[in-house]
Amino acid sequence: MQTALLKPKIIAVEPLGDHHAKVVMEPFERGYGHTLGNALRRVLLSSMVGYAPTEVTIAGVVHEYSTIDGVQEDVVNLLLNLKGVVFKLHNRDEVTVSLRKEGEGVVTAADIELPHDVEIINPGHVIASLSAGGKLDMQIKVEQGRGYVPGNVRKFGDESSKVIGRIVLDASFAPVRRVSYAVESARVEQRTDLDKLVMNIETNGVISPEEAIRQSARILVDQLSVFAALEGTESAAEAAAARAPQIDPILLRPVDDLELTVRSANCLKAENIYYIGDLIQRTENELLKTPNLGRKSLNEIKEVLASRGLTLGMKLENWPPAGLEK
């Protein structure tokens, strides 16, 4: 009897327009089309990385309910138009860009001054219309993120740093605009009870529909991998011990193993420095404050440590380890 689950062998991508495609996957076992289609759809809409304007400062504007002389749109509509600009950042998480224009005419996304590693997908997008004598001067902060983040959630954590006139925007980072899926019948040899998953995906151009599917699948695999590795419930202490960095065995050895002079060794023990791990965490200034330990003894300690690849002033996590005797 056949017990192995079928995996899709046919994956077809049919372009339907700019940044719009239909992705077909088959065959799936019965019921898997809806199971995977719904999971992929939710991840595509909520968890993909994108970019959005998050803060704006406009010259002469104190709050979003203002108007600007010579600009046909009020500030609320101007900000709504600005949210429609699709940014793409390369090798950075945030950037502040400028928009300066004056004189009669239409202001588009192409008028935004960009550094070399920032791209605008829709440069023809209209932001505002200026009349004769109109002037628009804006600073726009663009950030990387996931999903939708309301402005009141990400408002200034430190109110003292708030700049008068800085407007915080609701940010829609999601690069996937629309996703729908359908499950149709598929057939393999004599089996006719299989599923075909058809996904219709439209993005804003920051990512292609095919790449969006790949990334969403990776996210699901990553989230579910913890269940595949599940071997039972471990105690909190065991979990913490497993996460703790391993300590170099040389640090657990007593300072006597350094074969220091009697004077230096006695000075260290008087300061409760029993192990090499205790010693390397002390600084030169701290050791020089030790009674009867002078510059000569300090140099001796430094030379002995250097011969073992160690120095003073090192930082150790989880020191001392549990069970270390003093």
From Swiss-Prot:
The entry's keywords: DNA-directed RNA polymerase, Nucleotidyltransferase, Transcription, Transferase
Enzymatic reactions: RNA(n) + a ribonucleoside 5'-triphosphate = RNA(n+1) + diphosphate
EC number(s) per entry: 2.7.7.6
Matches recorded under SUPFAM superfamilies: C-terminal domain of RNA polymerase alpha subunit, Insert subdomain of RNA polymerase alpha subunit, RBP11-like subunits of RNA polymerase
InterPro entries per record: DNA-dir_RNA_pol_insert (IPR011262), DNA-dir_RNA_pol_RpoA/D/Rpb3 (IPR011263), DNA-dir_RpoA (IPR011773), RBP11-like (IPR036603), RNAP_asu_C (IPR011260), RNApol_insert_sf (IPR036643)
GO terms of biological process kind: DNA-templated transcription
Name of a matching Pfam family: RNA_pol_A_bac
Annotated GO CC locations: cytoplasm; DNA-directed RNA polymerase complex
Presence of the UniProt keyword Hydrolase in the record: no
Molecular function via GO: DNA binding; DNA-directed RNA polymerase activity; protein dimerization activity
Leader sequence segment: none
HAMAP family registered for this protein in UniProt: RNApol_bact_RpoA
Domain notes: The N-terminal domain is essential for RNAP assembly and basal transcription, whereas the C-terminal domain is involved in interaction with transcriptional regulators and with upstream promoter elements.
Known function: DNA-dependent RNA polymerase catalyzes the transcription of DNA into RNA using the four ribonucleoside triphosphates as substrates.
Family membership noted in the UniProt record: Belongs to the RNA polymerase alpha chain family.
Oligomeric and partner information: Homodimer. The RNAP catalytic core consists of 2 alpha, 1 beta, 1 beta' and 1 omega subunit. When a sigma factor is associated with the core the holoenzyme is formed, which can initiate transcription.
Listed name of the protein: DNA-directed RNA polymerase subunit alpha
Organism (species): Ralstonia nicotianae (strain ATCC BAA-1114 / GMI1000)
High-level lineage: Bacteria, Pseudomonadati, Pseudomonadota, Betaproteobacteria, Burkholderiales
